[in-house]
Amino acid sequence: MNGEYRGRGFGRGRFQSWKRGRGGGNFSGKWREREHRPDLSKTTGKRTSEQTPQFLLSTKTPQSMQSTLDRFIPYKGWKLYFSEVYSDSSPLIEKIQAFEKFFTRHIDLYDKDEIERKGSILVDFKELTEGGEVTNLIPDIATELRDAPEKTLACMGLAIHQVLTKDLERHAAELQAQEGLSNDGETMVNVPHIHARVYNYEPLTQLKNVRANYYGKYIALRGTVVRVSNIKPLCTKMAFLCAACGEIQSFPLPDGKYSLPTKCPVPVCRGRSFTALRSSPLTVTMDWQSIKIQELMSDDQREAGRIPRTIECELVHDLVDSCVPGDTVTITGIVKVSNAEEGSRNKNDKCMFLLYIEANSISNSKGQKTKSSEDGCKHGMLMEFSLKDLYAIQEIQAEENLFKLIVNSLCPVIFGHELVKAGLALALFGGSQKYADDKNRIPIRGDPHILVVGDPGLGKSQMLQAACNVAPRGVYVCGNTTTTSGLTVTLSKDSSSGDFALEAGALVLGDQGICGIDEFDKMGNQHQALLEAMEQQSISLAKAGVVCSLPARTSIIAAANPVGGHYNKAKTVSENLKMGSALLSRFDLVFILLDTPNEHHDHLLSEHVIAIRAGKQRTISSATVARMNSQDSNTSVLEVVSEKPLSERLKVVPGETIDPIPHQLLRKYIGYARQYVYPRLSTEAARVLQDFYLELRKQSQRLNSSPITTRQLESLIRLTEARARLELREEATKEDAEDIVEIMKYSMLGTYSDEFGNLDFERSQHGSGMSNRSTAKRFISALNNVAERTYNNIFQFHQLRQIAKELNIQVADFENFIGSLNDQGYLLKKGPKVYQLQTM
């Protein structure tokens, strides 16, 4: 915070006026003048000065006496914080003095203009308890704050109010002396009500422990924002007009709950009927917002078979509009209760209450800037690292073959598939997002998307769950039970107020993390909802008059089974999945897993499965990889690594033991890399990627195959940055680029190879065309000739079969062949066994 004091002159509004003598001048900014009785003839329009009863005219004297007595209270803002009468023997005085000493010592660390503008001050709980100013006078300050939070926070607020008042009075006296004005009278300053916001409060309470015994206690909890309501004005004090005498009183409404006064403040008046004056200057309102927090599930807190718990939180004053759905926040506040259903007809529901949190401070993990550069500010989900964590991260980073260790630690239960695991590991680390906060440029996503397609039983779902478990922020959903609104965002209607509120879906909750989607092929129409989120990394909503955009900066890892239950290499990826090319082209890597018999591989796989079932899996809880037993001690690991391709380097050779990194520690390592490491491409790495991209473009033009666009080049750059970030390096080297080129070639090998194992570059990589394009072209050309000759573009199924027989077209399944033409838009099905040619 800025320790400089700014704005001490009249023009900055530091104080309003001062008295030049005991009887001279009136200070217009005093809050006590709000208690003066207004002119009844203007307020009600009914009474005049002649009609006013005599007992009303006598009420000025007690108020004037009270205003005079207030001057002898040493704390100017006592009435703003406490309802009871000031007493020198009050136990609160000692607390206020302790907090006053604390704020007086640290006043230079705070920006006074900012405190007065916001009406709040941030107080670090660790500084409060570690410093001697408070703990010497209040030894059990933590217990006092936990058990009596409202009184303790009011004491803090009054203490900073007193410190600022004295500071302003001192500067007012200096200004009077500089301008040669007399200093005979009392200087009056107007400091607003200041709320003390305590942050860094410990310990964090788990949401499952927040029960009835926490009512009235001060707690801190961390969770994900899943719903945010609109900002509304909440009335805390209401002006009421007495119907009998016309007296106006300001009646407090605790927690914003409406209630009527029981009696008139005038002693001789017995009026019991009151009218609310909402536009009166005595009516006080504040900004109010409600959010819903969902608990964060960690390893030791996961409970099978139950949905995550949620709790409502109320934000007031300067806390409103401090978070959006999907943010991870730490909230400190007071646990309170509210009626379950205000308008319920059932009498039993009147005894049912709901717990909610009245927020005192909120810390948004995403709102804090982690690093700035010329490309814009990168925002990250801030994690906390202990000294033990940092030593473990340093030990992991010091490994020679770190890529191999992380790949084999990702999912040790699944044998093989090293390059697929490498792609998933690169998605966990991710690349660097460019131009995130530059409004003059379109942001470029840095999160890669991975698709794993293959036969059932090869461990796709387990690798997917392992990736979501290792990610610092991972959301796992299953495609066959997911709706479009569950993936993106839901617009729900609040039952109490009738307003619309946003509820975040899986992609928004996985912001700056991983979203794993299993059974990707069974999602139905939900694929269209992913198109915007995968490329623009945001979700736009336009429903019920609400138009907004929410961030969804997440890496999507999807696993899919082919339609027929077995992957048919005679078809393309699109035909196997029945999925559009627009969605498939957004995936950086598409891996094809096939269950092909291999005697050596099957022998190793069976040994691996039996060892795991027998409990012989090595689970030593350290982060080191054992040195290669089969390798000569004089040979450097780097020399061996540089000679072998990546697929060989990642394999665990017989006789070698790998001690995998525990997932809890690997999650810390990934979080540290995403938070602090932002690599850039070196010149050599950029040249390798450029040469590979140009070679792909040359082949696609020469062979008339699927188009290679800049999406492939951006994918290469993203994955290369992730490869450097995996080893905590700020620069991506030539070796990183070569590894990524090998992974990309492996991914393309599965999509381009046909049923005979040959590389057919005329096949569409993303499957927008037919498996055998020339056969389809010949058949459609023949249909065009027949339609032009007969002036009829309607064909029966037996006519289509006869034309194919005349052309000597050999296909394995003719019905499937016609269905593919229907999917591609060449034929339109008009009825049972009736098709219309669309190319006329």
From Swiss-Prot:
One of its GO terms (molecular function) is MutSbeta complex binding. One of its GO terms (biological process) is DNA damage response. Highest levels in placenta, lung and pancreas. Low levels in skeletal muscle and kidney. Expressed in various tumors with highest levels in colon and lung cancers. Its main location: nucleus. Induction: By E2F1. Gene3D superfamilies: 2.20.28.10, Nucleic acid-binding proteins, P-loop containing nucleotide triphosphate hydrolases. Component of the MCM8-MCM9 complex, a complex involved in the repair of double-stranded DNA breaks (DBSs) and DNA interstrand cross-links (ICLs) by homologous recombination (HR). Required for DNA resection by the MRE11-RAD50-NBN/NBS1 (MRN) complex by recruiting the MRN complex to the repair site and by promoting the complex nuclease activity. Probably by regulating the localization of the MNR complex, indirectly regulates the recruitment of downstream effector RAD51 to DNA damage sites including DBSs and ICLs. The MCM8-MCM9 complex is dispensable for DNA replication and S phase progression. Component of the MCM8-MCM9 complex, which forms a hexamer composed of MCM8 and MCM9. Interacts with the DNA mismatch repair (MMR) complex composed at least of MSH2, MSH3, MSH6, PMS1 and MLH1. Interacts with RAD51; the interaction recruits RAD51 to DNA damage sites. Interacts with the MRN complex composed of MRE11, RAD50 and NBN/NBS1. Interacts with CDC6 and ORC2. Interacts with HROB; the interaction recruits the MCM8-MCM9 complex to DNA damage sites. This is DNA helicase MCM8. It comes from Homo sapiens (Human).
